[in-house]
């Protein structure tokens, strides 16, 4: 489960931004017993959160930052920042040495074994600047550092700008001596420099393996700049097909239309040719291909796969721009479904729909805003919990938001 995630200097976010998935420590959480998971490690972790903001405010950049971090774990190629992903206000020159190109990503999670992992990565346009990885066994326990790597020297080799020699200060502890010996031999590297934690996993460190697997398999980031249903329509992933054929998937799908009583999956084109079967009040059976059904049904059909992964596979899903399908009524059904099941999955989604601003279904810690500074155009991420004057008996959150009192609305 995700405990917290923060990042800095990514796209429209110049300063540090953070999402914290811990439930509040006060009595408020007792009003929402289904909204969080009480872990054996001493944490109360939220199951859901919503991020609200205007168009072009930075919601997608927030989710894309996590997608970028996740992509770092896919291979062992050199890791560095890209100018197109650095905050524009930190790029005052074409010369990297005269710009602030360093980006930072920090994430804390609970692995499947119950071990708590804390990972920090700092990169610039050249390569890794600093990387650390530690673990502990409980919320109150002391973190034990496994690896700390800091760039000491960087110099160019030959005529190609991309040919760099890097020397790192590396400290390894709390792992096998054999692993430590291997890493001491990589302190000076002339080739590709992947993540140190990934290398730890490759050589067999159990903690690194668990964390890397969590980043690759448990974390799901869906951030598409076009219709999600159309995106899924051009894919044919076996894992999606497996989920679609589960009886429990139909239970989720029926939230969009309770007249749906069955589906006939098309193995070749499951997101377009699958037949949706409905039953009328009179008992008549109607069948229609998904591509000929309403856009809302098609869109929810695609997103229902991710909801399945949250509830039945304990995945951490970040979903961007689900407004086309999650109207307030359907969103309430979906959140109630996720909260009502016993699991360790999490669902965080972004939305323009201010009707999600509801303290009947959410704690203040579950509602986040993204707003943009009118002068610098920098984005900021913050929680409704940052407004102590907002009480749980407040019914005017929508009104406060529309007046700009809570931020997150477009400026003139």
What feature does the model see in each segment?
Residues 10, 321-325, 354:
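Conserved Walker B
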Residues 75-101, 109-114, 123-124:
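Short N-terminal edge-element motif at the start of the domain
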Residues 43-90, 300-301, 306:
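Phosphate-binding glycine-rich loops of NTP-binding sites
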Residues 1-4, 333-412:
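C-terminal lobe/lid and adjacent interdomain/linker elements of RecA-like ASCE P-loop ATPase modules
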Residues 2-68:
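Pre-Walker A-like glycine/lysine-rich segment at the N-terminus of P-loop NTPase domains
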Residues 48-54, 268-308, 312-326:
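Conserved ABC ATPase signature
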Residues 118-265:
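Electropositive, glycine-dotted interaction segments
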Residues 327-332:
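Short alpha-helix of the ABC ATPase nucleotide-binding domain corresponding to the H-loop/switch region
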């Amino acid at each position: 489960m995700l405990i917290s995630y923060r990042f800095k200097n990514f796209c429209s976010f110049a300063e540090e931004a953070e999402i914290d998935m811990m439930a509040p420590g006060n009595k408020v959480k007792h009003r929402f017993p289904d909204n969080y998971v009480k872990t054996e490690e001493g944490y109360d972790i939220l199951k859901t959160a919503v991020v609200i903001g205007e168009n072009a405010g930075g919601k997608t950049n927030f989710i894309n930052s996590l997608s970028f971090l996740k992509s770092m774990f896919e291979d062992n190629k050199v890791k560095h920042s890209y100018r197109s992903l650095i905050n524009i206000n930190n790029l005052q020159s074409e010369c990297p040495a005269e710009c602030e190109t360093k980006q930072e990503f920090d994430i804390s999670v609970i692995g499947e074994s119950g071990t708590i992992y804390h990972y920090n990565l700092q990169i610039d346009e050249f390569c890794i600047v600093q990387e650390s990885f530690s673990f502990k066994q409980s919320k109150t326990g002391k973190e034990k550092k496994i690896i700390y790597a800091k760039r000491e020297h960087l110099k160019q080799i030959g005529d190609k700008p991309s040919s760099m020699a890097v020397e790192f200060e590396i400290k390894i502890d709390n792992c096998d001596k054999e692993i430590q010996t291997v890493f001491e031999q990589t302190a000076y590297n002339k080739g590709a420099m992947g993540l140190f934690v990934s290398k730890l996993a490759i050589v067999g460190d159990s903690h690194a393996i668990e964390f890397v697997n969590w980043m690759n398999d448990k974390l799901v980031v869906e951030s598409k700049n076009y219709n999600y249903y159309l995106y899924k329509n051009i894919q044919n992933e076996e894992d999606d097909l497996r989920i679609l054929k589960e009886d429990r998937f139909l239970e989720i799908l029926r939230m969009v239309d309770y007249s749906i009583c069955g589906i006939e999956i098309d193995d070749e084109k499951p997101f377009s040719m699958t037949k949706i079967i409905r039953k009328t009040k009179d008992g008549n059976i109607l069948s229609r291909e998904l591509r000929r059904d309403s856009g809302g049904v098609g869109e929810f059909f695609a997103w229902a796969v991710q909801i399945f992964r949250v509830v039945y596979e304990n995945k951490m899903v970040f979903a961007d721009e689900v407004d086309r399908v999650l109207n307030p009524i359907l969103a309430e059904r979906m959140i109630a479904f996720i909260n009502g099941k016993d699991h360790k999955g999490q669902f965080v989604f972004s939305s323009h729909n201010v009707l999600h601003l509801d303290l009947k279904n959410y704690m203040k810690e579950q509602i986040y805003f993204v707003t943009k500074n009118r002068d610098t155009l920098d984005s900021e991420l913050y929680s409704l919990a940052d407004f102590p004057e907002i009480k749980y008996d407040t019914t005017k959150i929508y009104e406060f938001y529309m007046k700009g009192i809570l931020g997150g609305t477009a400026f003139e």
